[in-house]
Regions:
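N-terminal glycine-rich anion-binding loops that anchor highly charged ligand groups
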Residues: 5-21
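Active-site-adjacent beta->alpha loops and helix N-cap segments on the catalytic face
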Residues: 20-43, 60-65, 82-100, 111-114, ...
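Short, electropositive alpha-helical surface patch
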Residues: 63-79, 177-184
């Protein structure tokens, strides 16, 4: 983290998402982090300028405790993955309650179909489009089909109308994955 920060990386991630991820991505060559909640404190103590982004689990019965704990440990930004409904997105933002910035990780068909309601009715700080899980939900063979078939562009047009900062991703390490990132 310190090396990344030294070279002006502005966000350092801790990925706590575990619930349901192994099942969704079973048998695939995907990155599944083994971070623990204690890593939030360790990384927070090792950086001074970069923002600490923590991806938590999708909404579940212990979300309030998990989110409160990562805030106490120093998260600047919290990302909610794999949500499907406006209510889940609202619940997440309500739990965070302005104590950190919020990013919704749009990676389900349910969330994609409700994107208009989400951007109108949820007070998130950013939206990130997750290509990996979204392409799996659509039954596509390759995550970049979402770029080629116009799905990402369609979502982005809606997000841009509301001037919400956004990004998309799912690219593997430089020389890994079905399509090495250096070729993109």
């Amino acid at each position: 983290a310190q090396i990344a920060e030294k070279y002006t990386v502005d966000r350092i991630w801790v990925d706590l998402e575990k619930n349901g991820k192994a099942l969704r991505q079973h048998g695939m060559n995907t990155v599944q982090s083994n971070h623990q909640i204690e890593d939030v404190s360790i990384i927070r103590d090792s950086i001074s300028q970069a923002k600490l982004l923590v991806r938590v689990n999708p909404i579940y019965e212990k979300s309030k405790n998990e989110i409160t704990e990562v805030i106490k440990r120093g998260a600047d930004i919290i990302m909610l993955p794999y949500f499907s409904t406006v209510d889940e997105a609202k619940r997440f933002v309500d739990i965070v309650d302005g104590r950190a910035n919020t990013i919704l990780l749009l990676e389900t068909i349910g969330a994609e179909r409700k994107v208009d309601e989400i951007i109108e009715g949820v007070d998130m700080d950013e939206i990130h489009i997750g290509l990996n899980d979204l392409h799996l939900q659509y039954g596509l063979d390759f995550m970049f089909e979402l770029l080629a078939n116009g799905k990402v562009e369609e979502i982005v047009k809606k997000i841009k109308r509301k001037n919400i900062p956004f990004g998309f991703g799912g690219i593997a390490r430089l020389d890994e994955g079905m399509l090495p990132a250096r070729h993109i």
